A protein has these predicted regions:
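N-terminal leader/linker segments that initiate helical-solenoid repeat arrays
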Residues: 2-73, 77-92, 96, 123, ...
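Flexible helix-coil transition and linker loops at the boundaries of alpha-helical arrays
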Residues: 59-64, 130-143, 214, 221-225
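Short coil turns that delineate tetratricopeptide repeat
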Residues: 65, 99, 133, 142, ...
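TPR alpha-solenoid repeat register
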Residues: 70, 104, 137-140, 147, ...
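Canonical tetratricopeptide repeat
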Residues: 73, 107, 143-146, 150, ...
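Register position in tetratricopeptide repeats
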Residues: 80, 114, 131, 150, ...
Length: 330
């Protein structure tokens, strides 16, 4: 017969022991539950996508070494992984087959760039140009355009802006909307003293990327300073502040010149500043002020179109954090 002790007859020691046992069971149950939950939720760390792609590409080449497409994908993946010397080996093997010469030469140029071998990279980019420039689709050849741009960039890195300009002009003839090429051409024009050309291409660059990219405005400021256009240089400097994510520095500079020689650009700059703040009503007023002085001004018309009468939300991206990296379109 099982003996059951009535709770009313338990002494304090028995009651304490019972409580401790219950608490122990609760603790053990919690530990077991957490353990099973963690086990159920745990998954082995997945292999990074680029590593999986690399493994697959290596296997594809082992399975079918004569397949040029697979070898090209392997070489490109090596570049993505920063394994430039391995990539060059693969590109060389492709070139030995006399197939996909343009693509392999272009890829190898990028690998040489990664290794810092600029002369070798320039030789390969020039080889791509020599192959592609006479092609039927040369005027829309993205690889040709990128090669021209890269040759211009290399010339600028070597302090040769006059040599860079023809390459960059040819790149822009293929793709006029390349903001990076516009910016680089602008800096080359500034360096060679062609300030009017610099203003044209740098204004085009900031038209494509109006905020978040301060370098074109800084180049404009340098060009205007060289040309003796003090007010415009101050406008460009203020816009560089705005693009760099420091509107509090830009606003007083723009307000100080909005009644002078840079009135239209300063008013547009203030419109853009308030648009990025989300104050569409004030932005609309500044855009309207610019249009009063220059009724056909495209940036002012576009800005007013974005903010409407002040009630529409700005579609522009947020300003960057000060010091954050930024750039133009690829």
């Amino acid at each position: 017969m099982i003996r059951v002790t009535s709770p009313t007859k338990m002494d304090d020691r028995q009651l304490n022991r019972l409580i401790k046992r219950v608490l122990l069971l609760l603790v053990l149950g919690t530990i077991v539950f957490v353990g099973f939950y963690a086990l159920d939720r745990w998954r082995p760390a997945t292999e990074p996508i680029v590593d999986r792609r690399l493994s697959a590409a290596e296997q594809a080449v082992r399975d079918k070494p004569e397949d040029i497409a697979s070898r090209g994908q392997l070489a490109d993946t090596y570049v993505a992984k920063g394994r430039y010397e391995d990539a060059i080996v693969q590109y060389n093997l492709i070139l030995e087959s006399d197939k996909a010469t343009e693509q392999a030469t272009y890829g190898r140029a990028g690998a040489y760039m990664g290794l810092g071998q600029l002369d070798a990279a320039a030789t390969d980019y020039q080889a791509v140009v020599d192959i592609a420039k006479g092609g039927e689709m040369a005027h829309v050849d993205s690889m040709l355009q990128a090669s021209y741009y890269s040759l211009g960039s290399l010339a600028m890195q070597q302090g040769k802006p006059a040599e860079a300009i023809p390459f960059l002009e040819k790149a822009l003839a293929i793709k006029r909307s390349d903001a990076d090429a516009l910016y680089l051409a602008g800096t080359a024009y500034v360096a060679t003293g062609e300030t009017d050309k610099a203003e044209t291409v740098l204004r085009a660059a900031v038209a494509f990327v109006p905020i978040g990219w301060s370098e074109p405005y800084a180049a404009l400021a340098e060009g205007f300073t060289k040309a003796g256009k003090t007010a415009m240089a101050e406008w460009a400097g203020a816009m560089a502040d705005l693009a760099a994510g420091t509107p509090d520095l830009a606003e007083p500079r723009l307000l100080a010149i909005v009644g002078g020689d840079a009135a239209v650009d300063a008013a547009i700059g203030l419109g853009l500043l308030y648009e990025t703040k989300g104050d569409s009503a004030t932005a609309a007023q500044w855009y309207a002020r610019a249009l009063e002085k220059s009724p056909e001004n495209a940036p002012a018309r576009l800005g007013l179109g974005r903010v409407g009468a002040g009630g529409a939300a700005s579609p522009l991206p947020a300003l960057p954090e000060p010091g954050a990296p930024a750039g133009g379109n690829e």
